[in-house]
Curated annotation (Swiss-Prot):
It comes from the Bacteria. Its EC number is 7.1.1.-. InterPro entries: NADH_Q_OxRdtase_suD, NDH1_su_D/H, NiFe-Hase_large. It catalyses: a quinone + NADH + 5 H(+)(in) = a quinol + NAD(+) + 4 H(+)(out). One of its GO terms (molecular function) is quinone binding. Its main location: membrane. It is an enzyme of class 7 (translocase). NDH-1 shuttles electrons from NADH, via FMN and iron-sulfur (Fe-S) centers, to quinones in the respiratory chain. The immediate electron acceptor for the enzyme in this species is believed to be ubiquinone. Couples the redox reaction to proton translocation (for every two electrons transferred, four hydrogen ions are translocated across the cytoplasmic membrane), and thus conserves the redox energy in a proton gradient. It is a peripheral membrane protein. It is found in: Cell inner membrane. Belongs to the complex I 49 kDa subunit family. This is NADH-quinone oxidoreductase subunit D.
Length: 408
């Protein structure tokens, strides 16, 4: 038996031309501005970047393979660890995919609560992005202001599900809990302050000379680049392409709420910053409408599908059949029909999608995750050359990547 040769890391095959004034350096994988375990191999001429090669994989945990060895419900807490800044968005996309495979309809109240949770996560994610991006560029005050508001939003998540970061707040078939007493009033109070806070952030940054010098005409993504690299979210809309899955392929109740999709034609980092600010305003608008919709919905928060979904807790505690059914679903898992589905949502960072191939077993035969940050990291090899070494940190931070969903 012939022993196979050791697999060679891809960078061992890279060839860099040697000439005067040329330098090859490593950026990361341990770097405070890498926003995770990112390694960049940069070729420089003076302070100009002439070549950039992203190297990912330092945070790889085999999530897709883990999902293929877990029953469907068990995988939900694992999705929290992908984009851990907006954990509920991951729960939501996975739950929608399984529900599409099962062919079940979620109760209206559960849809309203889900939308509240994921839109609140969008604000949390955008505030975290602005805080860390501004800190990378050298603005300290905005970091403190953003984390102040983010703390209120995280308190709301903790009041609902008991967790601040990894929420596991959405279930296949609905949501585990109705909104606690007084929660809507707290949310309304938070939303009433957000327009003033967003105006404060813009007042500190939008006309700041240093901020504009660091972001304007830096990291320009053309429409052709955005489409060829598979960009989505703000990275795509910042290049003049109006595409948001909440509008183009509505899910839950997004076709019943009014909101605008901000678009910028500049393609640069400053244009993307302005989009993030406007997106927070639109999210506040959506949440106000959801607060008005909530009281008119029935109290049901889980789908009625005994073959796949456990009965309400009251029935499990009082009826033998419901208890036995719950025991089977928890220990052995549901058995979806044979087939394959893909479902995507508009997460805070772009299009987050799950592909599931089912063979009728309690475990997926194949689970594939389409994470937006993976594509936004790949584009760095086209985006960084031609700029300065000082712009590398600006561009990485501006693209809003998170490595939990890249190395999956």
């Amino acid at each position: 038996m012939q022993i196979p040769n050791r697999l060679q890391p891809f960078y061992e095959n890279l060839v860099f031309e040697r000439h005067d004034n040329q330098m090859v350096i490593n950026f990361g994988p341990q770097h405070p501005s890498a926003h995770g375990q990112l390694r960049l191999i940069l070729e420089l001429e003076g302070e100009k970047v002439t070549r950039a090669v992203p190297d990912v994989g330092y945070l790889h945990r085999g999530m897709e393979k883990m999902g293929e060895n877990m029953i469907y419900n068990e995988f939900i807490p694992t999705t929290d660890r992908m984009d851990y800044i907006a954990a509920s968005s991951n729960n939501h996309a996975f739950a929608l995919t399984v529900e599409k495979l099962l062919g079940i309809e979620v109760p209206r109240r559960a849809k309203v609560i889900r939308m509240m949770i994921v839109e609140l996560n969008r604000i949390i994610s955008h505030l975290f992005w602005l805080a860390t991006h501004a800190l990378d560029v050298g603005a300290m005050s905005i970091f403190l202001y953003c984390f102040r508001e983010r703390e209120f939003a995280m308190d709301l998540m903790e009041d609902y599900c008991g967790a601040r970061l990894t929420h596991s707040s959405i279930r296949i078939g609905g949501v585990p809990l109705d909104l606690p007493a007084g929660w809507l009033e707290k949310l309304k109070s938070f939303l009433e302050k957000m327009p003033e806070n967003i105006a404060l952030y813009e007042g500190l940054l939008s006309e700041n000379r240093i901020w504009k010098m660091r972001l304007e005409n830096v990291g320009i993504i053309t429409p052709e680049m955005a489409k060829s690299w598979g960009c989505s979210g703000v990275a795509l809309r910042g290049s003049g392409i109006q595409w948001d899955l909440r509008k183009e392929q509505p899910y839950e109740l997004y076709d019943e709420v009014e909101f605008d999709i901000p678009v910028s034609d500049s393609g640069d980092s400053y244009g993307r910053y302005k989009l993030y600010m406007e997106e927070m305003r639109q999210t506040v608008k959506i949440l106000h409408q959801l607060i008005e919709m909530y009281p008119s919905t029935s109290s049901e928060i889980m789908a009625h599908a005994p073959q796949y979904i456990s009965a309400p807790k009251e029935q499990i505690m009082t009826q033998n059949y419901s208890l036995m059914q719950h025991f089977v679903l928890v220990t052995q898992g549901m058995r979806p029909p044979v087939g394959e589905v893909y479902c995507a949502t508009e997460s805070p960072k772009g299009e987050l999608g799950f592909f599931i191939r089912s063979e009728g077993e309690p475990y997926p035969y194949r689970l594939k995750i389409r994470a937006p940050s993976f594509y936004h990291t790949g584009i760095l090899q086209d985006l960084l050359p031609g700029g300065y070494i000082a712009d590398v940190v600006t561009i990485i931070g501006n693209l809003n990547i998170v490595f939990g969903e890249i190395d999956r």
